[in-house]
């Protein structure tokens, strides 16, 4: 029997206001989008959906005290699914009937814990404050495993339907790396979702990560300490050699030895400043993000290569630019043996696990900070290209924000996106970047907030991913 036999009557005042504003704004939008989410529910059953029908029945979640984040009166439920993934469900006191299934960022290389779920609901409590139910898996497998994470995402949706209530509408939300998970879940289980929201998301497939091999090669050329000359040498595209015990702290120590990123620029030596600037210029990232990208290109890349039996990313034939003498730079990389070929079989396995083809037959709304140095905004163009190629281009609305943030773009940004997506699904009227920006300002005015917090850029024209990460 569902834990909520019926949903409470009424909706939050702000939710009613924002819905009304959305309807008004949508009435003037150009061109209808997908008329409803019903066609997705009627789509032919996929192989993954057929396989999911044989999954074991899931135990009911347990009612628990809510972690920090959800508003007063919200109900929180926890459990561990049949595959071993912890999850958290939150239902507001006055539920709209909409469910957002959240796919979190990362990935994290350790075992899944409730702490990860607590961190995400604290950040994404805006979903519940807007009146919507929230369900999120922590994913059974630590590390870069996308298909299994997509399965866990579908599984927590099924748990909600079986043990909490049947939603009026079900939406899929992918944040950061969770965008890759959500894209995979959307194609594996298309009949489960009526709309998709991507925020700061990885939506360009494996090419998103190519530059993490680039930064390893350029860093090693300049610093020569990862690995050191007296340590076993290995192809840097592996991340780390088998059996390595290197820690994050040890890597940071080496990076600071060469670049002194732990010091203000004024306290670095001229050589350290020059090396840091050169890496930033070639890789096209800010200096303060170099260490995080090297972490990924070391520890996460090692996880990826271990899972797929070889290096799925290489840099053979890549011509690097941004240095004072690009010809000399590329020749030096060639002579130093800092070119690495991707293993075709490992590449194929990696692509099969993580990639998407834009086959989303439901409304899709995205947002991204244009100065995001973790997941580059240019990946948004790849999403557009793929959805157009799949015949779904009319089902996409992309927004961009004046921000360098990645994990959370601000309290003002997400309510208008949620309402635009929900109203699109409900009415079939497609929003635009302009109407979403207008709605943001209206919601801010109604709630006593500052219109300046609505940093949407309706006229922003995103460039191709190849303009930021060299193609290979």
Task: Report residues per predicted region.
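C-terminal motif of bacterial Sec signal peptides marking the signal peptidase cleavage site
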Residues: 25-28
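Gly/Ser-rich "nucleophile elbow"/oxyanion-hole loop immediately N-terminal to the catalytic nucleophile
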Residues: 94-95, 156-176, 192
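Primarily recognizes the serine-hydrolase "nucleophile elbow" in alpha/beta-hydrolase
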Residues: 169-224
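Histidine-bearing beta->alpha loop at or near hydrolase active sites
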Residues: 396-409
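Short beta-strand element of the alpha/beta-hydrolase
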Residues: 97-107
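Short beta-strand/loop motif that positions the catalytic acidic residue
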Residues: 366-368
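Accessory cap/linker subdomain of secreted extracellular hydrolases
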Residues: 43-68, 202-355
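Bacterial signal peptide processing site
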Residues: 30-33
């Amino acid at each position: 029997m569902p834990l909520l036999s019926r949903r409470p009557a009424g909706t939050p005042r702000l939710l009613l206001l924002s819905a009304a504003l959305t309807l008004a704004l949508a009435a003037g939008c150009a061109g209808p989008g997908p008329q409803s989410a019903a066609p997705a529910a009627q789509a032919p059953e996929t192989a993954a959906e057929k396989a999911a029908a044989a999954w074991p029945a899931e135990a009911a979640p347990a009612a628990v005290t809510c972690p920090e984040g959800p508003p007063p009166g919200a109900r929180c439920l926890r459990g561990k699914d049949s595959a071993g993934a912890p999850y958290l469900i939150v239902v507001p006191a006055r539920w709209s009937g909409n469910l957002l299934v959240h796919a979190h960022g990362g990935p994290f290389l350790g075992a899944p814990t409730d702490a990860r779920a607590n961190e995400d609901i604290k950040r994404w409590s805006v979903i519940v404050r807007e009146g919507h139910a929230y369900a999120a898996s922590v994913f059974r497998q630590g590390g870069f495993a996308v298909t299994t994470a997509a399965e866990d995402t579908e599984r927590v949706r099924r748990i909600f339907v079986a043990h909490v209530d049947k939603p009026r509408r079900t939406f899929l939300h992918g944040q950061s790396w969770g965008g890759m998970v959500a894209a995979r879940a959307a194609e594996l289980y298309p009949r489960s979702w009526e709309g998709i929201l991507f925020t700061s998301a990885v939506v360009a497939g494996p090419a998103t990560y190519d530059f993490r091999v680039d930064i390893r090669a350029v860093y090693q050329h300049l610093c020569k300490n990862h690995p050191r000359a007296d340590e076993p040498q290995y192809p840097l595209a592996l991340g780390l050699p088998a059996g390595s015990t290197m820690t994050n702290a040890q890597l940071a120590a080496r990076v600071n030895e060469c670049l002194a990123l732990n010091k203000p620029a004024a306290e670095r030596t001229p050589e350290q400043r020059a090396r840091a600037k050169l890496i930033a210029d070639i890789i096209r990232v800010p200096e303060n993000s170099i260490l995080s990208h090297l972490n990924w290109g070391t520890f996460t890349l090692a996880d990826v290569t271990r899972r797929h039996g070889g290096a799925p990313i290489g840099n053979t034939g890549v011509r690097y630019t941004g240095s004072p003498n690009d010809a000399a730079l590329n020749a030096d990389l060639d002579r130093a043996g800092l070119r690495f070929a991707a293993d075709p079989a490992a590449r194929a396995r990696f692509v099969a696990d993580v990639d998407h083809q834009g086959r989303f037959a439901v409304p899709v709304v995205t947002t991204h900070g244009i100065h995001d140095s973790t997941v580059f905004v240019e990946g948004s163009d790849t999403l557009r290209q793929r959805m157009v190629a799949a015949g779904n281009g009319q089902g996409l609305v992309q927004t961009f924000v004046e921000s360098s943030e990645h994990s959370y773009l601000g309290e003002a940004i997400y309510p208008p996106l949620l309402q635009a997506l929900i109203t699109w699904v409900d009415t079939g009227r497609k929003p635009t970047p302009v109407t979403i920006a207008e709605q943001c300002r209206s919601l801010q005015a109604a709630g006593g907030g500052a219109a300046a917090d609505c940093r949407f850029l309706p006229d922003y024209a995103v460039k191709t991913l190849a303009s930021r990460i060299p193609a290979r």
